[in-house]
Swiss-Prot record:
GO terms for biological process: defense response to bacterium. GO terms for cellular component: extracellular region. Its main location: secreted. It comes from the Eukaryota. The keyword Mitochondrion does not apply. This is Guentherin. The keyword Transport does not apply. Coiled coil: none annotated. It comes from Sylvirana guentheri (Gunther's frog). Expressed by the skin glands.
């Protein structure tokens, strides 16, 4: 279960970073 949470956290972090990056590009 902990591994799944870690995977989800990584996905969320990546999505947040992508959103921030897109804002910078735009």
């Amino acid at each position: 279960v902990i591994d799944d949470l870690k995977k989800v956290a990584k996905k969320v972090r990546r999505e947040l970073l992508c959103k921030k990056h897109h804002k910078k590009l735009n």
